[in-house]
């Protein structure tokens, strides 16, 4: 390796002449790896007083030698790239109480430009003009000699760049040029700085740290060495066969290895919103959906277990279980042997699904209330004879209900004069989610008398031009419409007989379907 005079100078520093004298004596120094200036003149002796006993040792010198034998390459990028191997040294012989400044610079090793061909480096021309030399000052500087000698001095944060306009203080290098790193130990002056003519310093050079700057690795051997030794290059390594073998030997019968996919399936099934008490709790979150069964979950009767209620309830709450179970079974694709037509069911049969009246409960299950809301169209009857076959109760489910036209598409059989009974369009139809809360809010907002169901019923039966009103108490079924009402007063026609037996309905507690109107309104 050729070492030129300008290669080992400290450019743009006031001690440039002393650096040249240091480089001239370094060629005569038989010891490789360390360079120290001997006093040759009174001025030089004064400058270097107290710096003679300093020794520097390169850390991981064997690794550096491996790279040096092949031809060390260092990547340079526009943003800056760190060196590997990192430049780390061990310093001895410093005055423990004196403050020192440690810094590095990287200078051209020769005036040649290189190329890599035929698995070797060769000179291809004259070197480009060197960039202005930059000094990298160690972040701990200035510090006492005791601090520097206590541990390794690492310059791993130093970065190399090929951006000539780099504003971050990185070392600027040219690609395909050879460079030599140098370490400088400078005794700090009274201002904790350096640069004056009387500044004492020493420079240490390790030839095995020389490298060629490249934008991408040229020698595949260097690439392999960096992958094998750089802990940050583990992403380029393959799977470690020895590690897999060691893990396979650690497996035993007592602790079998379970695939992660199986664990995820078990966890998702345990926390499914359709199993156990989690399913009951999740029904409240489905209030915003149109129907709870539209999520497309199909299950068999063996998979549907009774929901576990964390609160103790009385026996009269059994309809919560039945309605929830029935709704899950309606979502099933299997045929049930106990299906019964809706119109053929008699009130004498003890079927919990068709009981005419239930004790009024404040905390009804969400699925029960939603199912009741889905059947509200059955309660709007008219005197027109049914032309189509009446569907069964099991057919009126979440899967077939969208075929029923909404209120917005229903035709009006007859219209009362505007002064007697103005047409009130029913704003909340069945496709807008749960019906019960919206009807209550509309009724309470329109007429304050709707809140009391008993007084409402008594008042509306005395008015001859009121729509049909359904009312039920805790111990009574659904009331039939008054006989004084005419068929023309029914606003909606669905082809269902007017007089239906009470057992064909679910009871809805305290809900006025149409706001109250009077002659004076």
Swiss-Prot record:
Q: Which residues bind DNA?
A: 63-238
Q: Mind listing the UniProt keywords for this protein, alphabetically? A: Cytoplasm, DNA-binding, Nucleus, Transcription, Transcription regulation
Family annotation (InterPro entries): p53-like_TF_DNA-bd_sf, T-box_DNA-bd, T-box_sf, TF_T-box, TF_T-box_CS
Q: Which Pfam families match?
A: T-box (PF00907)
Give the highest taxon in the source lineage. Answer: Eukaryota
Composition-biased stretches, type Basic and acidic residues, lie in 17-28
Role noted for this protein: DNA-binding protein that regulates the transcription of several genes and is involved in heart development and limb pattern formation. May bind to the core DNA motif of promoters.
> How would you summarize the oligomeric state and partners of this protein?
Monomer. Homodimer (via the T-box); binds DNA as homodimer.
Q: Per its record, how is this protein called by name?
A: T-box transcription factor TBX5
Q: Which organism is it from?
A: Gallus gallus (Chicken)
